Amino acid sequence: MKFVDEVKIHVKAGDGGDGAVAWRREKFIPRGGPAGGDGGNGGDVVLEVDPQLSTLLDYRYIREHKARNGEKGSGSDMNGKDGADLVLRVPPGTVVKDAATGEQLCDLGAAGERVVIAKGGRGGLGNMNFASSTNQAPRYAEDGTPGAERDLVLELKLLADVGIVGYPNAGKSTLISRISRARPKIADYPFTTLTPNLGVVGWRERSFVVADIPGLIEGAHAGAGLGHQFLRHVERCRVLIHLVEGANPEPGRAPKPDLDAINAELAAYSDELARKPQIVAVTKIDVPEARAAGVKLQKLLGRRKKPVPVHLVSAVTGEGLDALLDAVGRALFKEARPHRGGGGKKLAKPRARA
């Protein structure tokens, strides 16, 4: 299935039905009074979270969405039927914005969560409502009001606990396939991963969701290499695994400059991304030069005023993966590191608005 994470749609709620002008026509009542019923209310446009969905693909091809109009009132005090609501199902993690202003209208995450995004028009009153002692035969009724309509932008942000970031071909897809049951496309060239992949990782008696974010390049914060689409998914992640390729065949590439370049892109996109907990790992250490580069980066970052741990891992042999997942689990669940001679102590939604 093609992954679609941003679409623009137009929604139109149903119009209210007009009230009726009618009169009583019963036998033996030659001068019956007003009997025009009210119009029905127009249907609302409702967004509902469907956990079975993982993409906005359906809305790529169908942009116009309209709820049913309310029916007109009729004689004999008969009110028109209300228009049916139109329910648009979206995947968890959908952010809804007004296309004209950019204002965020709601952030839908929980399964079954619903929000009325366009309110149906009100049905008009029939002439029976306007009868009075001074006007016993009103010859007018009220028109229904139009339903709301607006252009919307739907953005999908993946709901993952951990995001794996790094340059293209840094080994992100291989890692997620090794630590979870996810099976992304893997090949030895950049940009193999064109859409995010999700995998569930078991850790001790818990589990967490990992997203393999497609490779970032310099200028991603400004949209280079589809950077905006990719960085959007990192925003929801609580912890980042920053993969750095130890042995890179491209000239001018090395672990430390790669690490700094990606961190600069995260910071340029948003301060929040720059502040996220990050675990650094050098990949492909089954290759001797990659291991040597990883050790060098360990020493370099270890000399900082606030040392940064660097994990050396190989998704091929499995070396270092357990230690990496332990670091991720502790960061996620805020679990204290065990002391020598003592056991470790465990420490310890968006509301939508229309």
UniProtKB/Swiss-Prot annotation:
Residue intervals of the OBG-type G domain: 160-333
Cofactor(s) the protein requires to work: Mg(2+)
Any single biological process term in GO: ribosome biogenesis
SUPFAM superfamilies: Obg GTP-binding protein N-terminal domain, P-loop containing nucleoside triphosphate hydrolases
Subcellular location: Cytoplasm
Domain Obg as annotated: residue spans: 1-159
Residue numbers binding Mg(2+): S173, T193
Broad class of where this protein is predominantly found: cytoplasm
Matching Pfam families: GTP1_OBG (PF01018), MMR_HSR1 (PF01926)
Binding-site residues for GTP, renumbered to this chain: 166-173, 191-195, 212-215, 283-286, 314-316
CDD domains cross-referenced by the UniProt entry: Obg
One term of GO molecular function: GTPase activity
Any single Gene Ontology cellular-component annotation: cytoplasm
DNA-binding in keyword set: no
Keywords: Cytoplasm, GTP-binding, Hydrolase, Magnesium, Metal-binding, Nucleotide-binding
UniProt-listed Enzyme Commission number(s): 3.6.5.-
Top enzyme class: hydrolase
Protein family according to the UniProt entry: Belongs to the TRAFAC class OBG-HflX-like GTPase superfamily. OBG GTPase family.
Protein function: An essential GTPase which binds GTP, GDP and possibly (p)ppGpp with moderate affinity, with high nucleotide exchange rates and a fairly low GTP hydrolysis rate. Plays a role in control of the cell cycle, stress response, ribosome biogenesis and in those bacteria that undergo differentiation, in morphogenesis control.
Subunit structure: Monomer.
Name listed for the protein in its UniProt record: GTPase Obg
Upper lineage: Bacteria, Pseudomonadati, Myxococcota, Myxococcia, Myxococcales
